């Protein structure tokens, strides 16, 4: 174990916060494969083991993601979160956790309040490859730097036939002023001041259209990570946009805007609730039931394979992505 690994172990033993402090800090130019251990809070969200979205580890038991990645009618225990691996489908290094509870922001609608928290079935064990990212403080004014990083397994080109990239991608993107972003997305707004703005206070814009650096379909729910005062802080959640990396920047849910709700949800999640007792019972029941059993009128039926479930999920994601506000 090297000096960095020893220091990391000491921090854990002393109970000192390790959020936003990856052990490895090697860099790869934006838009290419990310180095192992550089983004230890990055997680992949799966439905019946099929990749659907990204997310970030924000505590020992909570994942932050986009609300549009989740459908409330789907069975919670069919969701899993994979941590510790930068390659989708690599079962050798990833650690899998089931989702026991889903909390979607109560005001979520279309692109508004596009944020959700997932409670894992058990606490995560932190390692050099699995660490949480820090969240903004509600009591301290946060100065967002001019450049931050977006990570995910989404398309590297909008025209790509693949729905996601197997290797985790990273890109350094400039933060775009909200008013400037509003003018890009809503150019007639300056002539119609009564028109409702597109880029509201709960959104952040980021992207480099000249060098084609942007998030895209498949990156939904992933973090916008900013290096501030020596630690990595999540300031955004990949939400939507138009034409990946071309003429308009990507739009992210503003984590700072929803931080009070996030803190309150995390605080409640740390307490035992009904889901902690129900989840083991549900898993046991599933083990005893046949694969073709139905759980209700809104359930996606599984007959031997998960083809129908995947088609439903990918179809919803594709429609959201094509919708004027892009759901990745």
UniProtKB/Swiss-Prot annotation:
Known EC number: 3.4.21.-
Keywords recorded for this protein, A-Z: Disulfide bond, Glycoprotein, Hydrolase, Protease, Secreted, Serine protease, Signal
UniProt xrefs under SMART domains: Tryp_SPc
Coiled-coil stretches: none
Glycosylation sites (chain numbering): 263
GO molecular function, one term: serine-type endopeptidase activity
UniProt-annotated catalytic positions: 68 (charge relay system), 114 (charge relay system), 220 (charge relay system)
Intrachain disulfide bonds: 53-69, 148-226, 181-205, 216-244
Domain annotation Peptidase S1: ranges: 28-267
Protein name: Serine protease 48
């Amino acid at each position: 174990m090297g000096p960095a690994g020893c220091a990391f172990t000491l921090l854990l033993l002393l109970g000192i916060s390790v959020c936003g402090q990856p052990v490895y800090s090697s860099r790869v130019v934006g838009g290419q494969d990310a180095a192992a251990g550089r983004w230890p809070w990055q997680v992949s969200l799966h439905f019946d083991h099929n990749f659907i979205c990204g997310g970030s580890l924000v505590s020992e038991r909570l994942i932050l993601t986009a609300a549009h990645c989740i459908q409330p009618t789907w069975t919670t225990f069919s969701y899993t979160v994979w941590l510790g691996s930068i390659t989708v489908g690599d079962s050798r290094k990833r650690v899998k956790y089931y989702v026991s509870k889903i909390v979607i922001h109560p005001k979520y609608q279309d692109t508004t309040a596009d944020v959700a928290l997932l409670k894992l079935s058990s606490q995560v064990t932190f390692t050099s490859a699995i660490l949480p990212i820090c969240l903004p403080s509600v009591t301290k004014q946060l100065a967002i730097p001019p450049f931050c990083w977006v990570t995910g397994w989404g398309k590297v080109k909008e025209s790509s036939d693949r729905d996601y990239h197997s290797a985790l991608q990273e890109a350094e993107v400039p933060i775009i002023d909200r008013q400037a972003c509003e003018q890009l997305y809503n150019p007639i707004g300056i002539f119609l001041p009564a028109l409702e703005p597109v880029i509201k206070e709960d959104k952040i814009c980021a992207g480099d259209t000249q060098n084609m650096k942007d998030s895209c379909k498949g990156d939904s729910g992933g973090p916008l990570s900013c290096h501030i005062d020596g630690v990595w802080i999540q300031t955004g959640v990949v939400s939507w946009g138009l034409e990946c990396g071309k003429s308009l920047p990507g739009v992210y849910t503003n984590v700072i805007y929803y931080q009070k709700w996030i803190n309150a949800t995390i605080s409640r999640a740390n307490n035992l609730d009904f889901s902690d007792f129900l989840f083991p019972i549900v898993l046991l029941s599933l083990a005893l039931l046949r694969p073709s059993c139905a759980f209700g009128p809104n359930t996606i039926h599984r007959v031997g394979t998960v083809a129908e479930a995947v088609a439903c999920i990918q179809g919803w994601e594709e429609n959201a992505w094509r919708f004027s506000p892009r759901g990745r």
